[in-house]
Amino acid sequence: MSSPSPGKRRMDTDVVKLIESKHEVTILGGLNEFVVKFYGPQGTPYEGGVWKVRVDLPDKYPFKSPSIGFMNKIFHPNIDEASGTVCLDVINQTWTALYDLTNIFESFLPQLLAYPNPIDPLNGDAAAMYLHRPEEYKQKIKEYIQKYATEEALKEQEEGTGDSSSESSMSDFSEDEAQDMEL
């Protein structure tokens, strides 16, 4: 049996690092496809919200950026409301192999939520509201959090979709078990 490629080793290392950084990670099909529970950054209108963010790592990771998307609805100029697709220049255009998965959840996404770019929106309604009616924009975010982004809402969504038994939450694994996965 041959040893894993450098790209595969890097993928495994980055996923384990994300798990060890205390993010709740649910593996879907393999270490290249998983969901991370993401909490709204403090001091932003998104504070108090909780979202599931799907991450798909391409075969050429880390030289090609991961695909990320919100699984439950979020109201934001740079996130498509229907698909959850994130318009994030750092990830989509300027990603380099120097970045890792923790950068996405500890820097890129919090910055995007704190500082939307209404000039290049995926959600035109959110962009217009952000620019012209900021108080209404903040209220709409709060409404979305109450409806779609609470722990209770996530549980209801999981029950409604019938979570697959093949999913395993990495937060349930011991550190030794998580380290074994990178071998």
Curated annotation (Swiss-Prot):
The active site is at residue 87. It comes from Homo sapiens. SMART domains: UBCc. Residues 173-183 have a biased composition (Acidic residues). GO terms for molecular function: ATP binding; ubiquitin conjugating enzyme activity; ubiquitin-protein transferase activity. GO terms for biological process: proteasome-mediated ubiquitin-dependent protein catabolic process; protein K11-linked ubiquitination; protein K48-linked ubiquitination; protein polyubiquitination; ubiquitin-dependent protein catabolic process. This is Ubiquitin-conjugating enzyme E2 H. InterPro entries: UBQ-conjugat_E2_core (IPR000608), UBQ-conjugating_AS (IPR023313), UBQ-conjugating_enzyme/RWD (IPR016135). Its EC number is 2.3.2.23, 2.3.2.24. GO terms for cellular component: cytosol; nucleus. Accepts ubiquitin from the E1 complex and catalyzes its covalent attachment to other proteins. E2 ubiquitin conjugating enzyme that transfers ubiquitin to MAEA, a core component of the CTLH E3 ubiquitin-protein ligase complex. In vitro catalyzes 'Lys-11'- and 'Lys-48'-linked polyubiquitination. Capable, in vitro, to ubiquitinate histone H2A. The gene is UBE2H. CDD domains: UBCc_UBE2H. Residues 1-150 form the UBC core domain. It comes from the Eukaryota. The keyword Nucleotide-binding applies. Pathway: Protein modification; protein ubiquitination. Keywords: Acetylation, ATP-binding, Nucleotide-binding, Transferase, Ubl conjugation, Ubl conjugation pathway. Interacts with MAEA and WDR26, components of the CTLH complex that contains GID4, RANBP9 and/or RANBP10, MKLN1, MAEA, RMND5A (or alternatively its paralog RMND5B), GID8, ARMC8, WDR26 and YPEL5. The modification N6-acetyllysine is found at residue 60. It catalyses: S-ubiquitinyl-[E1 ubiquitin-activating enzyme]-L-cysteine + [E2 ubiquitin-conjugating enzyme]-L-cysteine = [E1 ubiquitin-activating enzyme]-L-cysteine + S-ubiquitinyl-[E2 ubiquitin-conjugating enzyme]-L-cysteine; S-ubiquitinyl-[E1 ubiquitin-activating enzyme]-L-cysteine + [acceptor protein]-L-lysine = [E1 ubiquitin-activating enzyme]-L-cysteine + N(6)-monoubiquitinyl-[acceptor protein]-L-lysine. Belongs to the ubiquitin-conjugating enzyme family. Autoubiquitinated in vitro in the presence of NEDD4L. Transmembrane segments: none annotated.
